[in-house]
């Protein structure tokens, strides 16, 4: 008898943010001590960001990821011994190796299953979700923990007004479980390696020394132009694969990069802004954590409900992008 195909369904979500909240006014005051001028009005007008959470010294990506994972597991009602795969999307791992996923596995007391990291910057969570979905569909996993976690504050040049105001730290997670009915309907992943220089942190560690530029650098205008183009096309492609129209989407949860990008994308897709989940005003850009954090907020406040159609999108350095369409 032919084995029935299993699908991956979101069974629970969780988010975790560092305790320290830094408002735009707080940040402006700190930057002013170094003769760098900015203001709450300047930041909000250009980005939509009002505050961000920053990890204290000594707090690691794996710690944030573990807390988000525990909340997602509680929400899903699963125990550590049920988790047979952990994927962490991060660009700010604790170590060169072992992977952050292995550290999370140990923290949770999960044993024996696969654990590895995915590095696709702000697209990382979408890449990780798609990877876990493929494992579950292939029958190679039944209960996967997918996490996006970052401490981007560690790789920012705090003398660069154009980037240091944009980012925050945090972690978000989902539990994907094998199900008879589709949860994840379709997913598309893409990259264009010729665009590496528009968003990168090009430093590396060799022979005990940091070589190159260790800080995040970004060409904001180029990122905007690329992001709105590829996300629009990706959304239409993933909907077409699933046999639905963009109008059928109940919620759009894009990477929380910049309110201008989100508003422009919503207009191109003709998705009303009231159906776009926006959290960057409170979280700033948390890179791979932004989509799962936004999903968790919208699930817990009752906006995202079971049975609804949710489109999640990531876009980031590489240049990478992707979309996941899921029935909740």
Swiss-Prot record:
InterPro entries reported for this sequence: ACP_syn_III_C, ACP_syn_III_N, FabH, Thiolase-like
Active site: 122, 255, 285
Keyword Cytoplasm: yes
Chain intervals for the UniProt region annotation (ACP-binding): 256-260
Record flagged with keyword Transferase: yes
Keywords assigned: Acyltransferase, Cytoplasm, Fatty acid biosynthesis, Fatty acid metabolism, Lipid biosynthesis, Lipid metabolism, Multifunctional enzyme, Transferase
Pfam families: ACP_syn_III, ACP_syn_III_C
Function field: Catalyzes the condensation reaction of fatty acid synthesis by the addition to an acyl acceptor of two carbons from malonyl-ACP. Catalyzes the first condensation reaction which initiates fatty acid synthesis and may therefore play a role in governing the total rate of fatty acid production. Possesses both acetoacetyl-ACP synthase and acetyl transacylase activities. Its substrate specificity determines the biosynthesis of branched-chain and/or straight-chain of fatty acids.
Domain notes: The last Arg residue of the ACP-binding site is essential for the weak association between ACP/AcpP and FabH.
Family matches, as HAMAP family: FabH
Name this polypeptide is given: Beta-ketoacyl-[acyl-carrier-protein] synthase III
Organism: Bordetella pertussis (strain Tohama I / ATCC BAA-589 / NCTC 13251)
Phylogenetic lineage: Bacteria, Pseudomonadati, Pseudomonadota, Betaproteobacteria, Burkholderiales
């Amino acid at each position: 008898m032919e084995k029935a195909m299993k699908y991956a369904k979101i069974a629970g979500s969780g988010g975790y943010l560092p305790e320290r909240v830094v408002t735009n006014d707080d940040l402006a005051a700190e930057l002013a001590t170094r003769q760098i001028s900015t203001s709450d009005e300047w930041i909000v007008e250009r980005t939509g960001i009002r505050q961000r959470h920053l990890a204290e010294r000594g707090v690691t990506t794996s710690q944030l990821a573990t807390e988000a994972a525990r909340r997602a597991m509680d929400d899903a009602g699963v125990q550590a011994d049920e988790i047979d795969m952990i994927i962490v999307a991060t660009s700010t791992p604790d170590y060169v190796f072992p992977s952050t996923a292995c550290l999370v596995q140990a923290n949770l007391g999960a044993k024996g299953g696969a654990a590895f990291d995915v590095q696709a910057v702000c697209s990382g969570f979408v890449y990780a979700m798609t990877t876990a979905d493929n494992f579950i569909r292939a029958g190679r996993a039944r209960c996967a923990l997918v996490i996006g976690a970052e401490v981007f504050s560690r790789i920012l040049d705090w003398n660069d007004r154009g980037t240091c105001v944009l980012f925050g730290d945090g972690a978000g997670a989902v539990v994907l479980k094998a199900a008879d009915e589709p949860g994840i309907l379709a997913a598309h992943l893409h990259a264009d390696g010729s665009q590496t220089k528009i968003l990168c942190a090009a430093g590396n560690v060799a022979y005990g020394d940091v070589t190159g530029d260790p800080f995040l650098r970004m060409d904001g205008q180029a990122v905007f132009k690329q992001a709105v183009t590829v996300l629009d096309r990706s959304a239409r492609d993933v909907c077409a694969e699933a046999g639905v129209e963009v109008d059928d989407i109940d919620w759009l949860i894009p990477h929380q990069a910049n309110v201008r990008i989100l508003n422009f994308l919503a207009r191109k897709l003709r998705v009303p802004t009231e159906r776009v989940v926006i959290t960057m005003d409170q979280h700033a850009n948390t890179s791979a954590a932004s989509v799962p954090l936004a999903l968790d907020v919208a699930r817990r406040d009752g906006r995202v409900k079971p049975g609804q159609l949710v489109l999640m999108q990531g876009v980031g350095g590489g240049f990478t992008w992707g979309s996941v369409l899921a029935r909740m």
